[in-house]
Amino acid sequence: MYCPRLDHFVRLNKNGSIGKCGHMTNAIGFETVKELEDSKWLKDIKATMAEDKWPKECVRCQQTEQVNGESIRTKSIDRHKVLHPFRDDYLVVGGVLDNICNSACQTCYSGLSTKIGSLESKNYPRVDNYVRFWEIPQNRILEVDVNGGEPTASKNYKKILNRLPPNTKIVR
């Protein structure tokens, strides 16, 4: 069994750490991409998957595939076929850039929406991963897929769009 996200996806977590797939349960955050890529935790997940077994962190994809026959994992295999020809060690960067959002969707919470945070208290969490984004190896980024907050309301998102590395092929 194979999941390209294990080799090619990094996410900006709302606490500022660097993580792997946002669909994982109980995923660990790391200080740097290198620390993540060199971690025993990630090596163990890859080893489990290489044995054609589901890592416990990947239960969401496992259940989705059992019900629907496809998942984030299978969709990432299709995306890998598009991106891999450009660069062997490419990265897709996802996750939370900030939590600037003027909406208060029922399924959201203050960690991803400043609107909800402001309704809950004056001392709500503020997320700002702008600097963290630039710490990711820019030459490896082929796709940017940030969320958390509302990108159209985020000054950070606009600043990143204006300075994307030229190797970036896809922005979602």
Regions found by a protein language model. Name each.
Residues 1-77:
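Accessory C-terminal segments flanking Radical SAM cores
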